[in-house]
Amino acid sequence: MLLANPLKNLGDINGTIYDFGKMGDILPKHNHEENTVHITIVARGKIKAYSHDWEVEGIAGQILDFRPNEPHEFMALEDNTRIINIVKKFGGQSNDYQQVNT
């Protein structure tokens, strides 16, 4: 079973942590807008990313980069695989940081 946990408070950067409980779990085919950068960090386990004319495998510690408007899908190749997807829009505002007094 695939679980998704959105990352919060990242300004113009959006992200989601995906946990694949079992080998064979799939994050369905999707694509990202033309004005975005999309990277995936393989946090643990092993993953296969693929599209109509390519496929790539990634293991824990690897970063995968995707072109805009390129449909792709992910499949876990090991139980308990985790990926972190980060999407940043071009031309977005930088994050607003507020100092915290401790």
Summary of predicted features, one role per range:
Residues 1-30, 36:
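A short glycine-rich, His/Asp/Glu-containing loop-to-beta-strand
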Residues 52-69:
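Short acidic-glycine-tyrosine-enriched beta hairpin
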Residues 32-49:
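Short, conserved beta-strand element in jelly-roll/cupin
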Residues 11-19, 75-102:
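Double-stranded beta-helix
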